[in-house]
Amino acid sequence: MQIPSKLKPYYENIAFEQEDSKMIINLGPQHPSAHGNLRLILELDGEQVVKARPCIGYMHRGMEKMAENMIYQEFIPTTDRMDYIAASANNYAYCAAVEKLCGLEIPRRAAVIRMILLELNRIASHLLWLATHALDIGAMSVFLYCFREREYVLDLIEKYCGARLTHSSMRIGGVMLDLPENYLEEMLVFCDKFPNDLKDYEDLLDDNRIWRLRTENVGVVTKEQALNWGCTGVMLRGSGIKYDIRKEEPYLLYNEVEFGVPYATQGDSYARYKVYMQEFRESLKILRQCATLYKDTPPEILATHPEYVSASKEQILTQNYSLMQHFVLITQGLKPPKGEVYVPTESPKGELGFFIHSDGTGRPYRLKARTPSYWHCAFFEEMLVGTYLADVVAIMGNVNIVLGEIDR
């Protein structure tokens, strides 16, 4: 008869030192403030965190391995499920990597439509961040107001692609559809209305004593820490480093529009909140300029390259060669030349990029996603040390992670 061995406590396996004055607790993986299935193992000395370890993997779906068994076009809807709060940002980052691998240049109108989708997506993502972060701290009114405006943004996205969350709105070589009738007019109505809503949020939070106490000098990140831990996006700009990939390595038509790069020097949670609020306004500037750019573009929305992009529906139904080429693309997939490529983009949460290694077949030999939340989550190991347990939830909400792109 086999004698079962006594199981060791979990903390012995992760080399936590045991002292009588210390206590180890689990925050998550099922906890409202974890923003997904995140488990934090915290060692406390009274109320102060002396050691923290993020444990991930509860949402792992093997996306990078799945890509190796899919044709290039087939993987686009899977990218929606990474950062599911900003699906269009994932769609674009992946499509841009494949397009660079193939040497495709997308039409000008497709670039404008992509920019519109990306900036609407950025606003929707930031609104969800502000809503949930405020709710974590106890500001219920802001939560409700943010969701009110977010509904309008999601309605605009739904009017274009038919989906509110998982968009699959882009195609390799361009976009799926042109903008519907009156779309720009509705978007500009939102652009005119939203600044007043932003002022309402700031009136509720900027001088709110509780909000200031819970965010000022809490979760401080120095420049050196931000760089050493690979922080990007607002986590980097909130620490005084004025870096935005849309400015440093412009893609689409970002080099043709005027917008600022908000940043702060304090490095605390309140500074990052102010950067987010200013980013809303910069996105509105970009959307207004995109509405002007769109009117001067020719109507093409997909690149013309039979080897990589299907012809139009009319051509497929009337031309034998287009029908055969479409059949090959759908059954075997496009076949980029051998090589490897990495394309960085500025997603709402930071630098999102895809590395693709092609062996010349219809499926990628290796695909690797560089997601900002993964790096920011790892930073909890240092960022939370020295803080109080009550501030852990506030810091987690402020960092703005999503588990879908951490676990993949």
UniProtKB/Swiss-Prot annotation:
Keyword Repeat in record: no
EC number: 7.1.1.-
Catalytic activity, as annotated: a quinone + NADH + 5 H(+)(in) = a quinol + NAD(+) + 4 H(+)(out)
Entry's Gene Ontology molecular function annotations: NAD binding; NADH:ubiquinone reductase (non-electrogenic) activity; quinone binding
Major localization listed first in the record, in broad terms: membrane
Disulfide bridge partners, by residue number: none
The keyword Disulfide bond is assigned to this record: no
SUPFAM superfamilies with a match to the protein in the record: HydB/Nqo4-like
Record protein name field: NADH-quinone oxidoreductase subunit D
Species the sequence originates in: Campylobacter jejuni subsp. jejuni serotype O:6 (strain 81116 / NCTC 11828)
